[in-house]
Amino acid sequence: MKVRPSVKPICEKCKVIKRKGRVMVICENPKHKQKQG
């Protein structure tokens, strides 16, 4: 899980979602997981 000021999809399978008011990226590739901090 990467914590970044700006999250963006890395590949086609990355999805940008909102959880508890936080923007997150979920993907099949665990390296692509990000959340906004």
Swiss-Prot record:
Spell out the InterPro entries in the cross-references: Ribosomal_bL36, Ribosomal_bL36_sp
Per UniProt, which keywords does this protein have? Ribonucleoprotein, Ribosomal protein
- Alphabetized GO MF terms: structural constituent of ribosome
Biological process, per Gene Ontology: translation
| Keyword tRNA-binding in record | no
Q: Which Pfam family, giving just one, matches this sequence?
A: Ribosomal_L36
Question: What are its GO cellular component terms?
Answer: cytoplasm; ribonucleoprotein complex; ribosome
Superkingdom, natural source: Bacteria
Give the family this protein belongs to, as stated in its UniProt record: Belongs to the bacterial ribosomal protein bL36 family.
User: This protein is called what?
Assistant: Large ribosomal subunit protein bL36
What species is this protein from? Thermoanaerobacter pseudethanolicus (strain ATCC 33223 / 39E) (Clostridium thermohydrosulfuricum)
